[in-house]
Amino acid sequence: MPSEKDGAKKSLMQRLALKSRIAKETLSEFLGTFIMIVLGCSSIAQAVLSRERFGGIITINIGFASAVVMALYVTFGISGGHINPAVSFAMCAFGRMEWFKFPFYVGAQFLGAFVGAATVFGIYYDGLMAFAGGKLLVVGENATAFIFATYPAPFISTPGAFVDQVVSTMFLLLIVFAMFDSRNLGVPRGLEPVVIGLLIIVLSCSLGLNSGCAMNPARDLSPRLFTALAGWGFEVFTVGNNFWWIPVVGPMIGAFLGGLIYILFIQMHHSKLDPDMKAEPSENNLEKHELSVIM
């Protein structure tokens, strides 16, 4: 029989358990974004601070994509695993999530990314201090700011960088919309995070040169703000011809375009009753409209 101690623990857990659905989803988005930033940015830190003895561009791309996968497995069933304001915006814009949830999701994502960046800084503090003789640099061969946020390649123009962010995020959302379209091929239940991780790898390997393939305003702006406060200074906002706003605005536009393109080219043309498509059980479609992500 359960002891009084077990009963007391259960009672405490019940009292602490959140009853509000939006509160649960907000915590989920915070934790998921935190996980993504800690594991993803740490994969960059390990490569940079070891001067590529413990990694390089391949391990960074795989590491960050895998961080997204892990974050999704933690959050998918609770909040849909957006972990990206651009994804949440697209979900709301196309009626797949209620607008009142948007500020809760986005606030949690930005806060989770900021705390995640602070955690990476703490983990690799000694390495950061040793890397450039105690200096925290934004540019140059000993720069470390790009461990936390993306920066443009020297050759890219401001319009080029903006288009780069729009296009990369457009592909992200276009394919995510396809994955969760029950009238299309779809993905086996439970494997969605893995396929999204593969998508992140493809995008990073093909569209990462120009400006780092952020595709996520929270992933970029919150860590950038942290670095400004932690010792790199506000040069993180002025470098690259004031590049900072591009990974914030570009993904929002790209996410909307990606969803719109999929709907216009594919989804709106589904027959109401397609004999070649078998309807999925309602259990498998539960809240499928909210499921999606990004880096």
From Swiss-Prot:
UniProt tissue specificity: Detected in testis and liver. Detected in immature spermatocytes and in interstitial Leydig cells.
Known catalytic reactions: H2O(in) = H2O(out); glycerol(in) = glycerol(out); urea(in) = urea(out); (S)-lactate(in) = (S)-lactate(out)
Instruction: Show where the record puts the motif NPA 1.
Output: 84-86
| Pfam families, per database record | MIP
Q: Which key words tag this protein in UniProt?
A: Cell membrane, Membrane, Repeat, Transmembrane, Transmembrane helix, Transport
- The reply on keyword ATP-binding is no
- GO BP terms in the entry: amine transport; canalicular bile acid transport; cellular response to cAMP; detoxification of arsenic-containing substance; glycerol transmembrane transport; polyol transmembrane transport; purine nucleobase transport; pyrimidine nucleobase transport
Q: Which GO terms describe its molecular function?
A: channel activity; glycerol channel activity; hydrogen peroxide channel activity; polyol transmembrane transporter activity; purine nucleobase transmembrane transporter activity; pyrimidine nucleobase transmembrane transporter activity; urea channel activity; urea transmembrane transporter activity
Main localisation, per the record?
Answer: membrane
Activity control: Channel activity is inhibited by mercury ions and phloretin.
Source domain of life: Eukaryota
**Disulfide cysteine pairs (residue numbers):** none
Q: Which residues lie on this side of the membrane: Extracellular?
A: 44-57, 124-160, 208-210, 226-243
Membrane-crossing residues?
A: 25-43, 58-77, 99-123, 161-178, 191-207, 244-264
Question: According to its UniProt record, which protein family does this protein belong to?
Answer: Belongs to the MIP/aquaporin (TC 1.A.8) family.
The free-text domain note is: Aquaporins contain two tandem repeats each containing three membrane-spanning domains and a pore-forming loop with the signature motif Asn-Pro-Ala (NPA).
What is the purpose of this protein? Aquaglyceroporins form homotetrameric transmembrane channels, with each monomer independently mediating glycerol and water transport across the plasma membrane along their osmotic gradient. AQP9 is the primary route for glycerol uptake in hepatocytes, supporting hepatic gluconeogenesis. It exhibits broad specificity and may transport various small, non-charged solutes, including carbamides, polyols, purines, and pyrimidines. AQP9 may also facilitate hepatic urea extrusion.
Q: What is this protein called?
A: Aquaporin-9
